[in-house]
Amino acid sequence: MALGACGLLLLLAVPGVSLRTLQPGCGRPQVSDAGGRIVGGHAAPAGAWPWQASLRLRRVHVCGGSLLSPQWVLTAAHCFSGSLNSSDYQVHLGELEITLSPHFSTVRQIILHSSPSGQPGTSGDIALVELSVPVTLSSRILPVCLPEASDDFCPGIRCWVTGWGYTREGEPLPPPYSLREVKVSVVDTETCRRDYPGPGGSILQPDMLCARGPGDACQDDSGGPLVCQVNGAWVQAGTVSWGEGCGRPNRPGVYTRVPAYVNWIRRHITASGGSESGYPRLPLLAGFFLPGLFLLLVSCVLLAKCLLHPSADGTPFPAPD
């Protein structure tokens, strides 16, 4: 896909200036390389995805999740179909392998957007988990960046999904149960709607985003993060929700679209005593633009349809050096 008009204009920006700035500390692992290339995935290097969480029900891994701040984890609502009692759950952070580690966080509360028993195609498959005590951030435990509510992720953008799920249909993750990663590309909504037909057209809902590999998320990856790199930091575009099988042709993985719920996330975190600065997000730059650059950026906003415009090989173009 060729560069969009927004991409062409951004290339004219002065060095070191971009449309967005990042809150320090989010989405920047100290391991710079994403590693090898979950179904069709590879073992992730230690520290590559420091926001990755393992949600466990009575010490057994049931879902993935992502750390938003020292006390909040994002996951999927359907992960809580086994119990709604917060004391039944533990959250493990900073771990590469699924082990019976004695180091874990207990859960203060679970906030669901929808019923955990919802069927595939049900909107609102997202949940927040408040930890009983804030975790200490380190090179192995860091938050992911959140998008803005108005953000979109264009078809063809290459992102990554991580988890401890099945490596293919019917095949659980083998020992040593290491975190796996796989690269996927965002699929345009109309194609995904055709791939998942239903009464009245499609079972795909507006709050859903699709991505395919050849790799894919699978059972036990639910709730885990789909992240895309923006200006050198990783931003969560979606949470693993559902799909028909794992890695099947014309059956992309379906994710809950995180931008659709950023305001919901903010509202519940602040209502529970947190501050808006208590979790990372991507604020728009408020100023410091040269007059000529300002005109270019205004034109970009008017012409662009998505947050990210892929380059010719489908990857986001980088921020200016």
Curated annotation (Swiss-Prot):
Similarity comment text for this entry: Belongs to the peptidase S1 family. Tryptase subfamily.
Active-site annotation: 78 (charge relay system), 125 (charge relay system), 222 (charge relay system)
Effect noted on mutating residue 126 to M: In allele gamma-II
Enzyme class, UniProt record, top EC level: hydrolase
Membrane topology field: Single-pass membrane protein
GO biological process terms held by the UniProt record: proteolysis
InterPro entries, alphabetized: Peptidase_S1_PA, Peptidase_S1_PA_chymotrypsin, Peptidase_S1A, Trypsin_dom, TRYPSIN_HIS
GO molecular function, one term: serine-type endopeptidase activity
EC numbers on record: 3.4.21.-
Protein name as it appears in the record: Tryptase gamma
Organism placement in taxonomy: Eukaryota, Metazoa, Chordata, Craniata, Vertebrata
UniProt keyword annotations, A-Z: Disulfide bond, Glycoprotein, Hydrolase, Membrane, Protease, Serine protease, Signal, Transmembrane, Transmembrane helix, Zymogen
A GO CC annotation given for this chain: plasma membrane
SMART domains with a match to the protein in the record: Tryp_SPc (SM00020)
Compartment(s): Membrane
Residues in the signal sequence: 1-19
Annotated Peptidase S1 domain residues: 38-270
Keyword Cell cycle among record annotations: no
Database matches in Pfam families: Trypsin (PF00089)
Listed transmembrane segments: 284-304
Residues carrying a glycan: 85
Disulfide bridge partners, by residue number: 26-145, 63-79, 159-228, 192-210, 218-246
Gene3D superfamilies per the UniProt record, alphabetical: Trypsin-like serine proteases
